[in-house]
């Protein structure tokens, strides 16, 4: 369960207005990680990369800072990058080796950028 915020500044007035809408039209379609890095020779084009803005919004709405975000289909690590940016921890699973390699790269970059000590699926114990 997500804790009620004791600090109203955690959700801005504009965020509340945007999020209360029935349709989220402010999500940029091009705000995605590079899924081409995870594509193998025999793969077809990934036709539906997930927008980071949507992921960030859902992570912020349904988790608290410090909690774990789990993605059973981690892909190139979009959920993990968004989770780390928002101060959450991340665990993910991915079966495809090319996506695992891309996710490792994206998560390492996010860990450096957001100076997190959180462990990810790809961190060494």
PLM feature segments, named:
Residues 1-125:
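Class I S-adenosyl-L-methionine
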């Amino acid at each position: 369960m997500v804790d009620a915020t004791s600090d109203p500044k955690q959700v801005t007035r504009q965020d509340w207005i945007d999020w209360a809408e029935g349709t989220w039209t402010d999500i940029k379609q091009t705000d995605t990680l590079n899924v081409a890095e995870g594509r193998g020779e025999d793969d077809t084009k990934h036709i539906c990369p997930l927008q980071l803005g949507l992921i960030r919004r859902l992570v912020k709405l349904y988790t608290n800072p410090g909690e774990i975000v789990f993605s059973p289909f981690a892909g190139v690590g979009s959920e993990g990058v968004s989770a780390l940016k928002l101060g959450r921890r991340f665990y993910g699973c991915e079966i495809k080796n090319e996506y695992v390699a891309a996710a490792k790269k994206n998560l390492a970059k996010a860990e450096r950028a957001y100076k997190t000590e959180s462990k990810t699926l790809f961190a060494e114990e």
